[in-house]
Amino acid sequence: MKNNSVRIAFWMVLIFIAGLPMSGSALPLKSQILGPKNSPVGLAHIYIDYVELMELDGTAKGRVSFVKTQSGFELFVVRKDEKNEWTGRASNRRLYGVEGKLLAFYDWTTFWSYVYAPDGTRLGQIKCLAFRGVCAAGAAAYLAGILEKQ
């Protein structure tokens, strides 16, 4: 009798665990993009190899993502619109437009990533608890205005 009780309890626990949603994930990490006066100007959903960028109301603006190229991996910026246009790339803590013009610098500490204009003016910051390179590049793309329609 005792053996049956243990067996029933085991199966009940197993069924309970199997019934839990498997979508429970720590990703995306969510962070606010702060402007030069430390007020929120946008949102970032950060994944391991890309970041989704949004307006404060959740409207998609674009994405920064690693892409495998012949020379390795590069970060590319894509504007979210009807064309999903490539608008720039990030490399060596710098953000460039499609034509190769330097648009912003970015750097990070343990928790914060900072974005600067080419003249050194601070454009803003974002709290990046993980995946700091892609997170900082995403904030740079958002703050430099590269996701705005031309």
Where on the chain are the PLM-derived regions?
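Short intrinsically disordered terminal tails
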Residues: 1, 25-26
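Bacterial N-terminal signal peptides that target proteins for export
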Residues: 1-10
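Bacterial N-terminal signal peptides
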Residues: 9-20
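Intrinsically disordered, low-complexity proline/glycine-rich segments
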Residues: 26-150
